[in-house]
């Protein structure tokens, strides 16, 4: 007789294979059709609120794997808080202004055509470009299963948003922190604009390293008693025409050599080795004796004043620093102190202008020459004063967009002064920011010191740009006096116009139209400031325009979390902190989380030329979004994250194990209608174990340590749960009577674990969790329509005195012997065996549980049969023997008294089925 029909075999509609690339888009589309974000908001009304404020990606190009990592990590954190029972807010946004978009438009038009167009037309084309890529990126993010307020995102180019950026600027001006002054700033000659620190990238560059002798003038020669020269060292010969000083350190010892050179004593040996100085020390010189005396610039014969500055070191060079206040921050500072002339002979395109002729700095042939191309010619002009020249490779600042080396150039710019105090406050903006860093929680903790040191060392923030596509620094200036009009009514009226017409109004309307009626100002006396704001000011104001304005249902200010790549310590985290610190005197965030960058499996940066680029949409098409999401969760995001086909295959294998574990549970609880609370020893053990593991997982997730949490979950599934418990339950699940207490207890334990585990995986594997709910029996899903009706459900408190370490060791030693017996073909199945033992820990279990633990046909104190092996655990003897009874054709245990007969348990079950059927 075939007993298969009498077995309670697993049944589920949940498929073994996910077919993720085909099925995910359909389910995602359903989510967005029924607006699950709104559903999530409604289902947590009145609950504690969690706000993640989205750092805006740039509306240019398709998303790359770094974007995917960032948005998925945000999505996981938002969903984790949701499944924890909190109300959540996640309003996505885009950075829409700035140079990269303007460059794309310029590329399409060509520079000549762009220069012929009015600003309003250029801005219109930039707006179209940004809008196109907002649409593209929005769909790409949605295709990653990211749930957010996609219907009401924030765009920094929206009219009301532009008005709020402008209002934030006006608030800072009101605090007295906005200053306009001429100062050297990072200048991109290729893009013809000033740059902020965050827009500068360091790349290797080959530069001429030169040592130049500046002869001391008569007065200085008299002072030291000998004709001599001070040697300076520089890697920017092109700045020498603008030299107005030579800086020495007041605390360093200098020497005069017998061949007539003044250098730092500590660097003399090095300079001798290089053949620059040949003489020995003639006498020691105090730098203070040379202060305010002069040397002669060999390029043009102009006098160069000797000044003292703490910035001069003896790490390299000569101990004497060539000082051109128009070309460097330190030079500028020391120049202010000594009132040195600021010469700026370089135009916005990085070429020498007419200043070199007017001020007699260089011959006329240099006019119009790019400064970097002029280096060699300047070296030729130096003649004998050039003591040594060699090329060196060094790290040099480059423009983040054009990738061309930048220059320092003194121009009139707008700055946020970090060392000034906001109105009515004793603390400077820098002090406010540093205090707020101390109050902020950092994930990982090292982010605190990184942000702190950047704020400690940062200069004033240059917020003006000489470009077209951005929010204008919309102030009026009195033509005669140069005074800027900060009249609150004037500023408010401009903001109102921007809200209605966008900031294009600054370019399309006249001064008269921009002044409020009856302002009392004569439009003919005023001119517009035509600079635009640094794009980092836009994104630094998002808290103001999104969280404070209440135009968006985006959550609370300050936000619970800001989350971006580790490069944002110098970017968005800092700009947001400075804008918020200036206006609100506090940080706009309670916590900052940073992640590393994506690299290939060898740890190398991705590039098209290397062919190691992993595109998120390619991963989605090949493996499925769930695999990408699981990769994010299982990677240590605190350092750089490795991704490759190999790594994704391993992640896919882990996903398969997880999916199959859920499938097994669903298939085996399909006939369970109510969860019971009367459990056996093994059920209590697995429930207690699961509770402890799930609490650890939840704790790690709360600290955003998803990799540690998933590692603990995976270990539990592979080892104790799927590896032991589900295996030992198979006999009772398939062969016991439908309502047998052992069977129902195990099903109940599984249902509880499935429910609790579902809430834990849902933030990461939302698609799979939703699919599980769809196919789950009612005992698991209750009235849930989808996964968004769920919350993390803690397991009940269950006491277990099961000696896990002892029992797992016994099972493991037994299985080693079973493997040997199978290899030797002595047995085919462990059910052919029985165990004889005196172990009180094993014998304390009821007969069924101890048999199931080892998957044998009996475990007794004494069984007389053929011995096949033995082992010991903590001194207790276990003897493995051949089963003496016959194989039951239904359960395959060797417990039948006669050949072909059923064992006692199976006979009862079959009899019961026959009675029920008659």
From Swiss-Prot:
It comes from the Bacteria. Its cofactor is Zn(2+). A motif ('HIGH' region) lies at residues 57-67. Pfam families: Anticodon_1, tRNA-synt_1. One of its GO terms (cellular component) is cytosol. It catalyses: tRNA(Ile) + L-isoleucine + ATP = L-isoleucyl-tRNA(Ile) + AMP + diphosphate. A motif ('KMSKS' region) lies at residues 605-609. Its main location: cytoplasm. Zn(2+) binds at residues 888, 891, 903, 906. The keyword Metal-binding applies. IleRS has two distinct active sites: one for aminoacylation and one for editing. The misactivated valine is translocated from the active site to the editing site, which sterically excludes the correctly activated isoleucine. The single editing site contains two valyl binding pockets, one specific for each substrate (Val-AMP or Val-tRNA(Ile)). Monomer. Belongs to the class-I aminoacyl-tRNA synthetase family. IleS type 1 subfamily. Catalyzes the attachment of isoleucine to tRNA(Ile). As IleRS can inadvertently accommodate and process structurally similar amino acids such as valine, to avoid such errors it has two additional distinct tRNA(Ile)-dependent editing activities. One activity is designated as 'pretransfer' editing and involves the hydrolysis of activated Val-AMP. The other activity is designated 'posttransfer' editing and involves deacylation of mischarged Val-tRNA(Ile). This is Isoleucine--tRNA ligase. It comes from Nitratiruptor sp. (strain SB155-2).
């Amino acid at each position: 007789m075939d007993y298969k029909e009498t077995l309670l075999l697993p049944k589920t509609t949940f498929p073994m294979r996910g077919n993720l690339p085909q099925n995910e888009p359909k389910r995602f589309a359903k989510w967005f059709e029924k607006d699950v974000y709104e559903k999530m908001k409604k289902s947590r009304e009145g609950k504690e609120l969690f706000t993640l404020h989205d750092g805006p990606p740039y509306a240019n190009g398709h998303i790359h794997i770094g974007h995917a990592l960032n948005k998925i990590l945000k999505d996981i954190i938002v969903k984790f808080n949701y499944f924890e029972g909190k109300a959540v807010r996640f309003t996505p946004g885009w950075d829409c202004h700035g140079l990269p978009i303007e460059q794309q438009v310029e590329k399409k038009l060509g520079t000549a055509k762009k220069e012929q167009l009015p600003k309003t037309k250029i801005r219109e084309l930039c707006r179209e470009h940004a809008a196109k890529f907002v649409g593209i990126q929005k769909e790409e993010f949605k295709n990653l299963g990211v749930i957010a307020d996609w219907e009401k995102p924030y765009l920094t180019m929206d009219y009301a948003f532009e008005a709020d950026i402008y209002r934030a600027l006006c608030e800072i001006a009101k605090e007295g922190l906005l200053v306009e002054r001429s100062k050297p700033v990072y200048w991109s000659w290729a893009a013809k604009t000033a740059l902020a620190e965050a827009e500068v990238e360091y790349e290797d560059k080959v530069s001429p390293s030169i040592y130049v002798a500046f002869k001391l003038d008569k007065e200085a020669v008299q002072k030291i008693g000998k004709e001599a020269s001070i040697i300076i060292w520089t890697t920017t010969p092109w700045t020498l025409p603008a030299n107005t000083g030579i800086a020495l350190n007041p605390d360093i010892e200098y020497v005069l050599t017998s061949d007539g050179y003044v250098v730092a004593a500590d660097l003399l040996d090095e300079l001798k080795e290089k053949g620059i100085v040949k003489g020995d020390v003639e006498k020691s010189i105090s730098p203070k004796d040379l202060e305010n005396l002069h040397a002669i610039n060999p390029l043009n014969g102009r006098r160069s004043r000797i000044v003292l500055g703490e910035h001069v070191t003896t790490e390299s060079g000569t101990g004497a620093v060539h000082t051109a206040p128009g070309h460097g921050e330190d030079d500028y500072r020391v120049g202010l102190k000594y009132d040195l002339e600021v010469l700026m002979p370089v135009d916005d395109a990085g070429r020498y202008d007419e200043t070199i002729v007017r001020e007699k700095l260089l011959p006329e042939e240099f006019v119009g020459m790019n400064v970097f191309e002029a280096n060699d010619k300047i070296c030729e002009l130096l003649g004998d004063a050039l003591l040594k020249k060699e090329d060196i490779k060094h790290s040099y600042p480059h423009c983040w967009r054009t990738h061309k080396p930048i220059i320092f150039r003194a121009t009139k710019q707008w700055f946020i002064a970090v060392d000034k105090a906001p109105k009515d406050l004793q603390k400077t903006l820098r002090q406010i920011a540093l205090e707020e860093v101390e109050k902020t929680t950092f994930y990982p903790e090292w982010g605190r010191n990184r942000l702190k040191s950047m704020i400690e060392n940062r200069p004033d923030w240059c917020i003006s740009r000489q470009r077209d596509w951005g929010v204008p620094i919309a102030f009026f200036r009195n033509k005669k006096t140069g005074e800027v009009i900060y009249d609150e009514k004037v500023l408010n009226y401009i903001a109102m116009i921007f809200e209605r017409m966008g900031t294009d109004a600054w370019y399309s309307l006249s001064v008269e139209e921009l002044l409020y009626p009856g302002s009392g100002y004569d439009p003919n006396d005023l001119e517009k400031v035509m600079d635009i704001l640094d794009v980092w000011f836009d994104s630094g104001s998002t808290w103001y325009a999104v969280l404070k304005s209440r135009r968006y249902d985006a959550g609370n200010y300050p936000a619970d979390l800001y989350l971006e790549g580790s490069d944002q310590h110098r970017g968005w985290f800092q700009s947001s902190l400075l804008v918020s610190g200036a206006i609100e005197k506090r940080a706009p965030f309670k916590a900052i989380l940073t992640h590393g960058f994506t690299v290939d499996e060898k740890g190398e940066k991705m590039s098209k030329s290397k062919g190691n680029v992993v595109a998120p949409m390619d991963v989605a098409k090949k493996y499925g979004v769930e695999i990408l999401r699981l990769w994010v969760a299982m990677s240590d995001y605190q350092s750089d994250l490795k991704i490759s086909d190999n790594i994704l295959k391993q992640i896919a294998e882990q996903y398969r194990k997880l999916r199959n574990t859920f499938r097994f549970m669903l298939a085996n609880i399909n006939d369970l209608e109510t969860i019971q609370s009367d459990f056996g020893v093994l059920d209590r053990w697995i429930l207690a174990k699961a509770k402890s593991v799930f609490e650890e997982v939840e704790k790690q997730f709360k600290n955003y340590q998803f990799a540690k949490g998933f590692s603990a979950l995976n270990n539990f599934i592979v080892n104790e749960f799927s590896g032991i418990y589900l295996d030992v339950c198979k006999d009772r699940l398939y062969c016991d009577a439908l309502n047998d207490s052992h069977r129902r207890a195990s099903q109940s334990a599984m249902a509880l674990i499935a429910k609790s585990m579902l809430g834990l995986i849902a933030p990461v594997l939302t698609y799979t969790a939703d699919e599980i709910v769809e196919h789950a029996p009612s005992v698991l899903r209750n009235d849930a329509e989808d996964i968004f009706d769920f919350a993390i459900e803690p397991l009940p408190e269950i006491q277990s005195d099961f000696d896990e370490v002892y029992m797992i060791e016994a099972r493991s030693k037994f299985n080693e012997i079973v493997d040997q017996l199978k290899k030797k073909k002595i047995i085919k199945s462990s059910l052919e065996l029985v165990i004889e033992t005196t172990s009180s820990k094993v014998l304390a279990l009821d007969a069924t549980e101890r048999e199931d633990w080892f998957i044998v046909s009996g475990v007794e104190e004494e069984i007389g049969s053929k011995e096949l092996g033995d082992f010991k655990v903590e001194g207790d003897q276990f003897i493995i023997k051949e089963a003496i009874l016959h194989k039951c054709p239904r359960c395959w245990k060797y417990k039948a008294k006669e050949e072909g007969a059923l064992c006692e348990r199976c006979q009862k079950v079959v009899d019961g089925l026959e009675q029920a059927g008659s």
